[in-house]
Each structure stands twice: as structure tokens, then as C-alpha cells.
């Protein structure tokens, strides 16, 4: 059965690759971006294209899509970017912009699409999280915070709409070879604090060196995302998890964090469990 996808942030990177993979799967794709002129290649491949800034409230978007396609089966909340800078270095306006796109933008789109899915009693919502949502990182703390927030929102929504046959997940990619870390996609805090250099400069340099040297293949990742969200191919018969960590590096990172969290939990258990009421 042909599915209708709504994907945000399709001008490049994962958004573009997921759109192409969904088209190759035989589905209908509504690809969106702030600048629709950057969607011409997807349009040539058969995608329907729409202008969408996730910060704006477009109450008519879902209505236009329904008229064109008959509904929306799968939403991929992909639009986002990374703000690089120490927590203290990032200004209020820079932090607000990061949260507006990465968190509130996802909420805007969810609020627009969920009424359609609730009415049909079916649908899939996928927030694009990140492996960064599992841990804080020097020089990327605000980005990591937005991705942790995105994932927790998805986990909460998942429980709220499960009885309506709507599935929700957070896709958490590791490092994939897209333009995400390139100039124009990654922004940096304007302020630099010399006292923090020892804590953040290594990460700044590492992100620059890692650009286009990431281990993940975005085309392979996109194909797996399509299979997971449609329950097809390698994912047939599997229940869509609350968190879908993507990439061999993501597996290693998550495994390591779980082990460290468990160690800390157990090592403090003798004192942290002594705070209950006596009776």
C-alpha cells in the first residue's frame, strides 16, 4: 500500500536522502524546505514540494497536502541544525534560535499533522533526534539539549497516542557523511571565552576534521529509516522502538553510556535509596 510522507528539511542531508529512499520505495513524498528552489532535484524525481519554515504556523499546509494526496501517513520531523559553542558562550538569541528550530519547530509540525492522523486512527511520527541526545558534549551542549528534548517529547507522545494506532519514534543517528558539520549548516557562537578554550577547542577542531569523514552512509541510513517506518524489508515484523539508534558508532556510544549510567546508579544505590518516607 502506497504511503504518503511529509518530510521537513529536505534541501540536503538526511531529509533529502529519506525523501529519495521513500520515493524509491514507491511511496508519495511531500518534501518541504524553507527555500523550495532547493527542492528541484526531488521534484524531478517525483516528489511533491512545499515551502515550509517550521517556525511559522501554516494552518493550511495539511489541508493542501490532503487535497493533493488524500492524507498523511508518515511524518519525519527532520529540520534542524547544530550550534557549536560552550554553554556560557552561547547568547540568549543563539540558544533561542537553536531551540526554536530543533524543538519548537518539531512541535509546530506535530500539532499541524496529528489531527489528520487522529481522525484516520493511524500514522507514524518520527522525530530526528541524535546520538547527542544521550550525552552532553563540550562545545555542543545546546545542540545535545535540544536533541534530548526532542527524544523525550517523542517518548511522551508515543504513549499518548498509542491507543489511536499512531506510532511515534525518535531516530538517533550517529555521525553520517552529510553536510551537517559543514559551513552554512553548522553555526558557531559569536562569543569565545579564553578560559573555556581548554574545554571546547578540541571539540571544535574535531568537528571540523570529522566533516565528510563520518563513518555513516546517509543513503544506507535513509533506506533503513524507510524500512523501519513502513515495517518493510529488514524491519518487517519488528515493533518500531521508542528510540532507533542508527549507525555502528551510535550502537557503541549508547552501549557505553548505558554501562556507565548503570555503574553510577549501582555505586550510589546505598545512599540514594535511603530517602523514602519512614511509614
Regions found by a protein language model. Name each.
Residues 86-87, 94-96:
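Substrate-binding pocket helix/loop in short-chain dehydrogenase/reductase
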Residues 110, 146:
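Active-site helix of classical SDR
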Residues 163-239:
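SDR active-site lid
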Residues 130:
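Residue(s) in the substrate-gating loop at a strand-loop-helix junction
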Residues 88, 135-141:
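Active-site loop immediately N-terminal to the catalytic Tyr-X3-Lys motif
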Residues 11, 19:
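N-terminal Rossmann NAD(P)H-binding glycine-rich loop of SDR-like oxidoreductase domains
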Residues 44-57:
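Rossmann-fold cofactor-recognition segment
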Amino acid at each position: 500500500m502506497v504511503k504518503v510522507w511529509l518530510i521537513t528539511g529536505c534541501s540536503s542531508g538526511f531529509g533529502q536522502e529519506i525523501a529519495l529512499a521513500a520515493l524509491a520505495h514507491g511511496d508519495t513524498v511531500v518534501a518541504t524546505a524553507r527555500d523550495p528552489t532547493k527542492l528541484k532535484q526531488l521534484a524531478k524525481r517525483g516528489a511533491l514540494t512545499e515551502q515550509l519554515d517550521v517556525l511559522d504556523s501554516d494552518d493550511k499546509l495539511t489541508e493542501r497536502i490532503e487535497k493533493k494526496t488524500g492524507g498523511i501517513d508518515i511524518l519525519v520531523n527532520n529540520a534542524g541544525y547544530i550550534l557549536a559553542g560552550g554553554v556560557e558562550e552561547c547568547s540568549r538569541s543563539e540558544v533561542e534560535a537553536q531551540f526554536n528550530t530543533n524543538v519548537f519547530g518539531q512541535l509546530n509540525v506535530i500539532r499541524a499533522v496529528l489531527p489528520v492522523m487522529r481522525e484516520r486512527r493511524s500514522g507514524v511520527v518520527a522525530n530526528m533526534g541524535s546520538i547527542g541526545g544521550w550525552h552532553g558534549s563540550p562545545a555542543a551542549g545546546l545542540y545535545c539539549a535540544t536533541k534530548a528534548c526532542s527524544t523525550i517529547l517523542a517518548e511522551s507522545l508515543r504513549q499518548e497516542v498509542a491507543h489511536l494506532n499512531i506510532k511515534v519514534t525518535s531516530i538517533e543517528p550517529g555521525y553520517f557523511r552529510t553536510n551537517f558539520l559543514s559551513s552554512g549548516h553548522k553555526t558557531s557562537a559569536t562569543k569565545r571565552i579564553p578560559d573555556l578554550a581548554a574545554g571546547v577547542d578540541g571539540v571544535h577542531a574535531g568537528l571540523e576534521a570529522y566533516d565528510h569523514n563520518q563513518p555513516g552512509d546517509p543513503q544506507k541510513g535513509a533506506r533503513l529509516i524507510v524500512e523501519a517506518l513502513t515495517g518493510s524489508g529488514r524491519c518487517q515484523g519488528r515493533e518500531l522502538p521508542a528510540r532507533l539508534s542508527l549507525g555502528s558508532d551510535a550502537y557503541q556510544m549508547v552501549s557505553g553510556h548505558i554501562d556507565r549510567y548503570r555503574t553510577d546508579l549501582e555505586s550510589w544505590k546505598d545512599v540514594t535509596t535511603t530517602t523514602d518516607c519512614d511509614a
